[in-house]
Amino acid sequence: MSRVGVMVLGPAGAGKSTFCNSIISHMQTVGRRAHIVNLDPAAEATKYEFTIDIRDLISLDDVMEEMDLGPNGALIYCFEYLLKNLDWLDEEIGDFNDEYLIFDCPGQIELYTHIPVLPNIVRHLTQQLNFNLCATYLLEAPFVIDSSKFFSGALSAMSAMILLELPHINVLSKLDLIKGDINKKKLKRFLNPDAMLLMETEGMNQASNPKFLRLNQCIANLVDDFGMVQFLPLESNNPDSIETILSYVDDITQWAEGQEQKEPNDQIDVEE
């Protein structure tokens, strides 16, 4: 039987840890067993404890001190060390064959865009440990206030989709922060990215450098031509919002198919 997990990705500050905590809270409410696997060697304490924590193997602070490296260099060193010691990860995961695992990943996108660290870990999980994985990429909703930032984030999401080679869900997080700043009609154009949004924004700025206008047009057209990037709205404090996103993840990972069928009751009580 395949194991099931979700990789939580996105830039720093996108709300990944909050999203992980919300999933755990929802699953506990409905009686599902789930655990957070922390893959960020610089992670801070969260509401729910990490069941598996890369910092038990190696931590960013220790590497920076002992190897005299900066934060980014130390992060890469930590993941290269993890790749050389995947037997540690195998042993830790080995105790959780039937539980749902939530992999909380670092926010540095170079771990999958510049060096194949996360893609290698994903391949190990899917091929060696028999995981059905879904990737969720979080982009914070305030980015929609600046169309250029939004399309930059959408391009990063598309990069993750292509390089990780996993079924993928993009999530527009922290939606509650922009409710008073954008109407539903315009928000829908961001959930299904409309290339014209970027052109409309740049068109209002007559002082824009023509080279930037052409670059923005190419970026917007690239996202539009691929047709891969769409977003689901997320409010982490809204149980219905969490349940909706989790239903998409469950459908992709085929979670329900791996559950044992329950025998029906022999006798049904009927109220008189």
From Swiss-Prot:
Query: Known EC number(s)?
Result: 3.6.5.-
By sequence similarity, the record places it as follows: Belongs to the GPN-loop GTPase family.
**Protein known as:** GPN-loop GTPase 3
Effect annotated for changing E110 to K/A = Impairs heterodimer formation with NPA3/GPN1
Quaternary structure per UniProt? Heterodimers with NPA3/GPN1 or GPN2. Binds to RNA polymerase II (RNAPII).
InterPro entries according to UniProt: Gpn, Gpn3, P-loop_NTPase
Q: Where is this site: Stabilizes the phosphate intermediate?
A: N72
UniProt keyword list: GTP-binding, Hydrolase, Nucleotide-binding
Chain's role: Small GTPase required for proper nuclear localization of RNA polymerase II and III (RNAPII and RNAPIII). May act at an RNAP assembly step prior to nuclear import. Promotes sister chromatid separation during anaphase.
Per UniProt, the short sequence motif Gly-Pro-Asn (GPN)-loop occupies residue numbers 70-72
GO molecular function terms listed in the Swiss-Prot or TrEMBL record: GTP binding; GTPase activity
Q: Where, in this chain's numbering, is GTP bound? A: G13, A14, G15, K16, S17, T18, S173, K174, L175, D176
Which BP terms from GO are recorded?
mitotic sister chromatid cohesion; protein import into nucleus
Which CDD domains does the UniProt record give? GPN3 (cd17872)
Statement: the UniProt record of this protein carries the keyword Nucleotide-binding: yes
Task: Answer whether the UniProt record assigns the keyword Iron to this protein.
Answer: no
Which superkingdom is the protein from?
Answer: Eukaryota
